[in-house]
Regions:
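Acyl-donor (CoA/ACP) binding surface of acyl/acetyltransferases
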Residues: 1-18, 22-27, 58-158
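Conserved GNAT-fold acetyl-CoA-binding loop/helix
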Residues: 28-48
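Short loop/turn motifs at secondary-structure junctions and domain boundaries
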Residues: 49-55
Length: 158
């Protein structure tokens, strides 16, 4: 377990999943992240794969002993990415920045992150953690859905 201040990273427990499910359903969070919410079956299938995939490195974020969200890294099309999600009640407290900084001490590989250009809070988190803009892209957030302008951020490994 990684601990510093009031933010802790630990292995994901099965009991975290219902909290993650509700967090990813929040309309404000979905709108800000420009991400789609999964229904229960799709969510369960997604996390079942994550939890057994040896390439995925994922941690639960706790704040004051409450499950605040998750942070993880994964491979996609030959690149290593990092992503994080916080429940709305944990926004604006510096939790995402602290959690990502702690995570980066454990996963020291070169990482990329995609962030919607409209997601200013997440852009600030990435920049505070040493990520810089490496490019931009348009990405469909759902099959057949609208496309979103993304920044591609990158942070070198050590």
């Amino acid at each position: 377990m990684l601990e510093s201040g009031l933010v802790t990273l630990r292995d994901v427990a099965e009991t975290d999943l219902p909290i993650f499910f509700e967090q990813q359903r929040d309309p404000d969070a979905v709108r800000m992240a420009v991400f789609f919410s999964r229904d229960r079956n799709a969510f369960d299938a997604h996390w079942a794969k994550i939890l057994v995939d040896p390439v995925v490195f994922v941690k639960t974020i706790e704040f004051q002993k409450n499950v605040a969200g998750n942070v993880g890294s994964f491979e996609l099309q030959g690149q290593r990415y990092v992503g994080y999600w916080l429940g709305k009640g944990f926004w604006g407290k510096g939790i995402a920045t602290q959690a990502l900084m702690k995570f980066l001490r454990e996963d020291r590989r070169r990482l990329q992150a995609r962030v919607a250009k409209s997601n200013i809070a997440s852009i600030r988190v990435l920049e505070k953690c040493g990520f810089t803009i490496a490019g931009e892209d348009r990405l469909a957030i759902q099959p057949g859905g609208e496309e979103v302008d993304d920044w591609v951020y990158e942070r070198g490994g050590s």
